Swiss-Prot record:
It comes from Danio rerio. The keyword Transmembrane helix applies. Residues 1-28, 91-107, 171-192, 267-275 are extracellular. SMART domains: 7TM_GPCR_Srsx (SM01381). Keywords: Biological rhythms, Cell membrane, Disulfide bond, G-protein coupled receptor, Glycoprotein, Membrane, Receptor, Transducer, Transmembrane, Transmembrane helix. Coiled coil: none annotated. The lineage of its organism: Eukaryota, Metazoa, Chordata, Craniata, Vertebrata. This is Melatonin receptor type 1B-A. Glycans are attached at N4, N10. Belongs to the G-protein coupled receptor 1 family.
Length: 287
């Protein structure tokens, strides 16, 4: 009997979700198919790319270093969202609503948040690692030994867990029919939303920007032969690795900046600003 009551409650919540705004039920079939296609393509690329990265590092002894440890951690963070949340999002798209229960919704939202915040924290850790390797060569080995790297990796995921756990107590992980997924609600708590955007996006972006700017300055100085102190640290392979991670950072920042800026704007005045955000803009920033 309790299971039947729970099922009825879940179905009712789905029905209410469809009626909210211009929810999933009001969306043309071709739009749903396009979004589903984008999600499937993204999932396949995520799995293939990140699994190849992990296998390459594990199989090649030369790639097993402190810098690549954070790259593997980043790949793992990306895979979190593919293993559970994305299949449920695809299921919600094809069924015009969320059919699984509330627990599945919470788990999906938790893993999606862990993936996003874990990614930004790992990208930050990679930038700091590259900065220390290239600009602070004398202290690099002291910080990034085997034990130090393990401690820093653990710290990245502990901070990620600390960042996500408040969502469970605040009840801010809810189903959003605009994006067919259980995600962080930007209107649950204005103060918490501002804190999330500031601490988990703007601050890491500032740290990464500082690190890469310092590296760029040093690279330009070396190329212009202003200094030769760090030339051994700027081998072509290391420069390519730096450029690759810099591109990853730029793409991540560009992709996630719109959603975070929308959240910041909504948090300032949820009742007034929230309804002004067009569904298409929110969906585009999310996907």
């Amino acid at each position: 009997m309790p299971e039947n009551v729970s099922l009825i409650r879940n179905r009712t919540e789905v029905g209410q979700g469809r009626a909210w705004g211009s929810g999933a039920g009001a969306r043309p079939a071709w739009v749903v198919m396009v979004l589903a296609g984008v999600l499937i393509f993204t999932s396949v690329v995520d799995v293939l790319g990140n699994v190849l990265v992990i296998i390459s590092v594990l199989r090649n002894r030369k790639l097993r270093n402190a810098g690549n440890a954070f790259v593997v951690s980043l790949a793992f963070a990306d895979l979190l969202v593919v293993c559970y949340p994305y299949p449920l999002v695809l299921h919600a798209m094809l069924h015009a609503g969320w059919l699984p229960g509330e627990m599945e919704c919470k788990v999906s939202g938790f893993l999606m948040g862990a993936s996003v915040i874990g990614s930004i924290f790992n990208i930050t850790a990679i930038a700091i690692n590259r900065y220390c390797f290239i600009c602070q060569a004398n202290t690099y080995e002291k910080i990034y030994g085997r034990a130090g790297t393990l401690v820093l990796l653990t710290l990245v995921w502990v901070l990620t867990a600390i960042a996500i756990l408040p969502n469970l107590s605040l009840g801010s992980l809810t189903y959003d029919p605009r994006v067919y997924s259980c995600t962080f609600s930007q209107t649950t708590s204005a103060g918490y939303t501002i804190a999330v955007v500031t601490v988990h996006f703007l601050l890491p972006i500032a740290v990464v920007t500082f690190c890469y700017l310092r590296i760029w300055v040093l690279v330009l100085r070396v190329r212009r032969r202003v200094t030769t102190d760090v030339r051994p640290r700027l081998r072509p392979s290391e420069l390519r690795h730096f450029l690759t991670m810099f591109v990853v950072f730029v793409l991540f920042a560009v992709c996630w900046a719109p959603l975070n800026l929308i959240g910041l704007a909504v948090a300032v005045d949820p009742p007034r600003v929230g309804p002004l955000v067009p569904d298409w803009l929110f969906v585009m920033s999310y996907f």
